[in-house]
Curated annotation (Swiss-Prot):
Gene Ontology BP terms: mRNA cis splicing, via spliceosome; rRNA processing; spliceosomal complex disassembly
Keywords: ATP-binding, Helicase, Hydrolase, mRNA processing, mRNA splicing, Nucleotide-binding, Nucleus
Protein known as: Probable pre-mRNA-splicing factor ATP-dependent RNA helicase prp43
Transmembrane segments: none
Catalyses which reaction(s): ATP + H2O = ADP + phosphate + H(+)
Gene Ontology MF terms: ATP binding; ATP hydrolysis activity; helicase activity; RNA binding; RNA helicase activity
Domain (Helicase C-terminal) ranges: 275-455
SMART domains in UniProt: DEXDc (SM00487), HA2 (SM00847), HELICc (SM00490)
Amino acid sequence: MEPAQKKLRQESKNPYLAHLNNGDDSEEVVSSKGLTRRATTVAQAAKAEEGPNNFFNDKPFSQNYFKILETRRELPVYQQREEFLKIYHENQIIVFVGETGSGKTTQIPQFVLYDELPHLTNTQIACTQPRRVAAMSVAKRVADEMDVDLGEEVGYNIRFEDCSGPNTLLKYMTDGMLLREAMTDHMLSRYSCIILDEAHERTLATDILMGLMKRLATRRPDLKIIVMSATLDAKKFQKYFFDAPLLAVPGRTYPVEIYYTQEPERDYLEAALRTVLQIHVEEGPGDILVFLTGEEEIEDACRKITLEADDLVREGAAGPLKVYPLYGSLPPNQQQRIFEPTPEDTKSGYGRKVVISTNIAETSLTIDGIVYVVDPGFSKQKIYNPRIRVESLLVSPISKASAQQRAGRAGRTRPGKCFRLYTEEAFRKELIEQTYPEILRSNLSSTVLELKKLGIDDLVHFDYMDPPAPETMMRALEELNYLNCLDDNGDLTPLGRKASEFPLDPNLAVMLIRSPEFYCSNEVLSLTALLSVPNVFVRPNSARKLADEMRQQFTHPDGDHLTLLNVYHAYKSGEGTADWCWNHFLSHRALISADNVRKQLRRTMERQEVELISTPFDDKNYYVNIRRALVSGFFMQVAKKSANGKNYVTMKDNQVVSLHPSCGLSVTPEWVVYNEFVLTTKSFIRNVTAIRPEWLIELAPNYYDLDDFDNNKEVKSALQKVYQMAARSKKNARR
């Protein structure tokens, strides 16, 4: 940094903190290169970008930087930089619409950097993303574009991973992480500009952030807010944000031919694989993007396509084909492989790459070279039914808006083709116009806890863009009251305050905070980490029997939670190499991730003064204590064996469920606690552990009040017996 810049940084008042110290925020901030804060011109910014030294750290630019700069200046958004700066200078809030591929996610934050001069005012620019993958991937790209180290001037912050530091000026972060930051700093005072990207996705966290930004705009007139969307339906955003001005930038799009199937496909996965191989053999050059619904489906498709493509290459029937998966829990280094060059053409045919992705590739990431899109028309969506208190990820038809976004991926570099694996009639008549906002289809317990921590007590009149159903809100308040996170007046309790500090669902947080009462907080910490990462068990189609046999080595007869602990203890006892995991059909990646999550949660426990203790392993109550701790957080997720002995019935909600096929219980206990309710062809409960019914009335007497079970005589009768037994035990203890 130049001496003049250092001096300015030390001497200038921070205009962003004027609302805290009543300082004069009219002081002009000027860089040593003549750029004036919030008055920078395109010519000045372009000159600063051209060096010879980096504007933000004064280091010489690399040769690669100038090549990337040329590419950046060809992006559609760059052509409207001047128009953007004019609107940005004149308004506090802007709604910005840029189609995917326009460059908005990478360029707009950089335009803002050269105008805000955060390195002179000790502030930062935040750019939120709905997905972890996008936050990491875009931060890496922008760090390369700015010729800085990732984690220095440009960083990212996602749940359980903070890659930023004291020098960070631009931070890409998940919307959930900015929301967590607002819980400790209601004014978000470190930021001079907050950019909410991919707002059209309407995630729960983005919707709450929009409400907060609206409140903050009046309290912090110095704060600039940009709401960015990839869809042209921006009027709703404009109206919500005080009729904010709109700037729209077209993407670089070529015409895309849409093909539909003649008849509905019975197996969309098989149809997708068939279509990919057909494109590879018969169509002209260009890469392929396939949309599937989740990790298991994607990995399975990658294996099958690779095997088939290798056969085609050996037979000389097609050119080389590289297949890459893309989904949220994929490690960053593997995510980046989607940007690797396409294989070279051969005499047998064109070289291609195939990216098989979840809906993250709809708008969050742009992959150059895609000419063909295969769209089966499905995605996994969170669905919540407040009446039966069940939240589940369901494979559901996408919306028309999503279908259009997917098709648009094919026309980025040349005319493309989109193969929709459904009929045109289904597109017109069966697909809804827009995906429902997440706030209308989610359990709101975590959100209510966050809003309470943010100091928002009137949840009903909070300015939601789309207000949630009153029943959903009441269910959330009721659940938090039963967990003792909210008192009867709806105010945060000491336990609720602690729970809000953990980046966990309330029931997991409560279980962790209460675990010292059962002398097993070390074990519950490990278990919480394991429940916060993808499945540690690997069960490939080609070796299911062997994988199941290996799992038996770790299986605990009393339940899946204890089985998970056995896996973790074996992993940590020095066994946990990548080879050991491979041989035991365990995900090395998930176990490493669980280890990192555990470290982060442990730090939070230390800050919140939650004691770390264990029952000695040889104590007969070692596993009993862990099971009791499970009940302390998950007493609302309990099921009792039904009268016929074949199924289970959930408490209060009377849902008939079966144990998931992955369940490792050696017998079917009378009472179980479960982590997940899974809806597929029928209702399953997953991650199940046996419990004793007397623990329910001991640890959650308010929830297990007999008067609340009038609609389920079978369960009420069983609970009455438990109460009678408890009363007899108490009476005998007094003698």
